[in-house]
Amino acid sequence: VRSRGLGDVYKRQAIYEGSFENTSHGFRPRRSCQTALTQIQDTFLGTKWFIEGDIKGFFDNIDHNVLIGILEERIADERFIRLIRKFLNAGYIENWKYRHTYSGTPQGGIISPILANIYLDKFDKYMEEYAQSFNKGASRRLDKDYRRIKDRKNKLEKKLKSETDTKVRKDLIDKIKGYYRQMQQMPCVMEMDEEYRRLKYVRYADDFLIGVVGSHEECGQIKANITQ
């Protein structure tokens, strides 16, 4: 019965796999700690602040009724739900000892990582909605000093196109190169643009990382909101 029940769990996993967020990397097909790190490298560009979190004692504090309720949202098979409740009551979640592995494969547990992802998918979706409401602006505005130098360079380049005197052209080219060197040594956009905000989120098992482009005060508010 136990083997048949485990087979049912794996079959049901396919129901959820397609709806899991792209930010979830723990114990999923073709997902690992490495894919989580790659996503951070690719998407946390320009991040000013990091909020690192782990859901302490997560596997010891899963609310069984909440988990069953989440399962019932998509699974109408009462026999399967009863089977999962038996697994929960038998302590399969609490007795599962999570240990990091390079492959991202859980050691010592079978059902727990599947149910944990289903349970934490609610948090992943909450963070996706939170990011959408937090994000502001299409892009950072140009830094004022950078824009001023760029405007001067553009004017000289425009003048250069119509200039025919060799000496004047050389002087213009030297000045343009000077402005270009200045631009390379300064930030092109405003580092703290009040009209631009971004929040990025990645989770691996019960560890997650949030990247914020915004103020320190906004980071404090984010921490307070997700702790609730």
Predicted regions and their residues:
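Charged boundary/loop elements
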Residues: 13-18, 22
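Conserved polymerase palm-domain catalytic core
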Residues: 22-23, 28-31, 35-227
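Single conserved hydrophobic/aromatic residue that forms the stacking wall/gate
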Residues: 1-10
